[in-house]
Curated annotation (Swiss-Prot):
GO biological process terms held by the UniProt record: DNA catabolic process
Function: Bidirectionally degrades single-stranded DNA into large acid-insoluble oligonucleotides, which are then degraded further into small acid-soluble oligonucleotides.
Gene label: xseA
Domain of life per record: Bacteria
GO cellular component: cytoplasm; exodeoxyribonuclease VII complex
EC number: 3.1.11.6
An example Gene Ontology molecular-function term: exodeoxyribonuclease VII activity
Family stated for the protein in its record: Belongs to the XseA family.
Name the record gives this protein: Exodeoxyribonuclease 7 large subunit
Enzyme class: hydrolase
């Protein structure tokens, strides 16, 4: 008997004995394919099975399934003869309550909310011009590279960036994140970003850890939670001082661009000039009214005295304006010096090389001979072969 013959016999056997059965479990992974077909894994406490629901069947389902949904399926078991891989083909689907992940998330969220960990009274304000910024994430992640690239594009060279490497997925991730958070919180930073790119509900579930949530709450450093995408919510989002929908959005929230700072200074100068002109116009009008009043009352001496007072006031205003302008010039010089000091760091970053294999960032120790990789810098990329 050949392999093909065996697979065909097993396929016929499975499909004849396991048809029109009810299967229940929790979605642990799902792909909504562009073709309209749905491919997902269904699990219980001990096992999982690959499932598919083709377009013709899922058009009748009144919702889009997601990781964490607890479902009841009707369908049959089938085997793909070419690979010998069997799966459950669903013909109908309905929700059967919450899955384990969703239930754990909601229970912890409710309990921490009752304890007051999400109360706005405890939220710390973010700094307007941060000078020491920490980022907790995987040092090899694409999210980190995107964040550093965006900082460089903004030309915000006032801040020094501290990177704290941590696991952002898996059972060991909460402990790793807590250790990194404690280390960062002891460094007197202006603000701290906890970041991770997108992923499945299971991939992001380490950010629903209770111990991590309590560590974030008691930290003295303002914390931004930037986990996943816009639609992803985790416990760290609620307990942090600010929630950013993505890692890049955290950078946009925290950092002004060089152009923004220049425009802000120009606006301040314009407002000072307007204020000065307004006050001078008021004093001129007052002087004119006083002159008219005392002229009719034949009090030239009093008019002269008021004129002198007006001149004194004008001198005081000139002095105040000059001091304010000097202060703005000193502040601008300070910002410019800080910009020049940190500009060198970002010029060096242009020489950094990122190695990607199969579209993912690769570690040098994982590469083998004849591997095809993509070498990327800030300005170009090349394909290379490992010798």
């Amino acid at each position: 008997m050949t392999v093909s013959e065996l697979n065909l016999k097993v396929k016929a056997l499975l499909e004849s004995y396991f048809e029109n059965i009810i299967l229940s479990g929790e979605i642990s992974k799902i792909t909504l394919h562009g073709s309209g077909h749905w491919y997902f894994d269904l699990k219980d406490e001990k096992s999982s099975i690959s499932c598919a629901m083709f377009k013709g069947a899922n058009l009748k389902v009144g919702f889009k399934p997601a990781v964490g949904d607890f479902l009841e399926l009707c369908g049959s078991v089938s085997l793909y003869a070419e690979s010998g891989r069997y799966q459950f083909i669903a013909t109908s689907m309905k929700k059967a309550g919450f899955g384990d992940l969703e239930a754990q998330f909601l229970a912890l969220k409710e309990r921490l909310q009752k304890e007051g960990l999400f109360d706005p009274r405890f939220k710390k304000s973010l700094p307007k011009f941060p000078k020491k910024v920490g980022i907790i994430t995987s040092k090899t992640s694409a999210a980190l590279q995107d964040m550093l690239k965006l900082i460089h594009q903004k030309e915000y060279f006032l801040a020094k960036i501290y990177i704290f490497d941590a696991l952002t997925q898996g059972n060991n991730a909460p402990f790793s994140l807590i250790q990194a958070l404690r280390k960062a919180d002891d460094m007197d930073l202006d603000v701290l970003i906890i970041a991770r790119g997108g992923g499945s509900r299971e991939d992001l579930f380490c950010f629903n850890d209770e111990n991590l949530a309590r560590e974030i709450f008691k930290a003295k450093t303002p914390i931004i939670s930037a986990i996943g995408h816009e639609i992803d919510y985790v416990i760290s989002d609620f307990v942090s001082d600010f929630r950013a929908p993505t890692p890049s959005a955290a950078i946009d929230t925290l950092f002004y661009s060089k152009l923004d700072i220049e425009q802000s200074l120009d606006l301040m100068e314009e407002k000072l000039i307007q204020l000065w002109n307004h006050k001078m116009q008021n004093y001129e009008n007052l002087l004119l009214n006083l002159s008219k009043f005392f002229k009719f009352n034949s009090l030239p001496k009093i008019i002269d005295e008021k004129i002198k007072q007006s001149h004194n006031i004008e001198k005081q205003l000139n002095h105040l304006l000059a001091n304010q302008m000097r202060y703005n010039e000193l502040k601008l010089d300070k910002l410019q010096n800080a910009y020049l000091q940190h500009e060198n760091f970002f010029n060096k970053s242009k020489k950094f090389i990122c190695i990607r294999k199969n579209g993912k960032i690769a570690n040098l120790e994982d590469l083998k001979s004849d591997d095809i990789v993509i070498l990327s810098s800030q300005i170009s990329q090349k394909e290379a072969k490992i010798l």
